[in-house]
Amino acid sequence: MINYLRGQAIEVIKTPNNRLILILDVNQIGYEIQIPSRLALDIGNNNNDSCQIFTHLLLREEQPLLYGFGTAPERELFRQLLSVNGVGAQLALALIDTLGIEELVVAIVTGNTKILSKTPGVGLKTAERIALELKTKLAAWRQLREATTTITAILPAAAILEDVQMTLLALGYSQEEIDRAMAVLSQDALFSKNTQPEDWIKGAINWLG
């Protein structure tokens, strides 16, 4: 599985069926990656400089297809959409392109089918199905993502944070468990001002049980 590709954006080609294909040169190998129009615009604004694309490989009988996104959360949302019955890759891309990641997640979590139906090809029944099947999953995902984003502004210096993470890893906790614990602790007003790694370690261990 290809997690991401980093290379030189050669060009973005628009196919006859209006799909945008990025030609990405990685070590003299040109990859064809279908991307959302929002990402194509970003690449154009950056004068086709070196970029990192988070990819999803979709295996079809005819040929394998690569889809690319500017961020890992966008790719994760794309994958969540693909898990919904009746939602294919093109519709998932259209949803992300039309609404953007934040508005799309909010619409799904709140069950706002009117907003979801703004996307071409998404009727009321499809919108209802998306909201029904993903509401709970995306509510938890959104909460963790927001908490993780908040950590950057709240946690102590990077060196202290590294000490905390290395200690917890040495104690046998996984990186995912550590991230969850730190996300929760960062919401505590006392921890947000604490610069003692020992306190963060104890707090994480207590939370993880």
From Swiss-Prot:
Q: What is this protein called?
A: Holliday junction branch migration complex subunit RuvA
Q: Which NCBIfam families match?
A: ruvA (TIGR00084)
A GO MF term? ATP binding
Q: How does it assemble?
A: Homotetramer. Forms an RuvA(8)-RuvB(12)-Holliday junction (HJ) complex. HJ DNA is sandwiched between 2 RuvA tetramers; dsDNA enters through RuvA and exits via RuvB. An RuvB hexamer assembles on each DNA strand where it exits the tetramer. Each RuvB hexamer is contacted by two RuvA subunits (via domain III) on 2 adjacent RuvB subunits; this complex drives branch migration. In the full resolvosome a probable DNA-RuvA(4)-RuvB(12)-RuvC(2) complex forms which resolves the HJ.
Q: Does this entry carry the keyword Chaperone?
A: no
Q: Where in this protein does the record put region Domain II? A: 71-149
Location of the region described as Domain III in the Swiss-Prot/TrEMBL record: 158-209
Q: Name one Pfam family in it.
A: RuvA_C
Which keywords annotate this record?
A: Cytoplasm, DNA damage, DNA recombination, DNA repair, DNA-binding
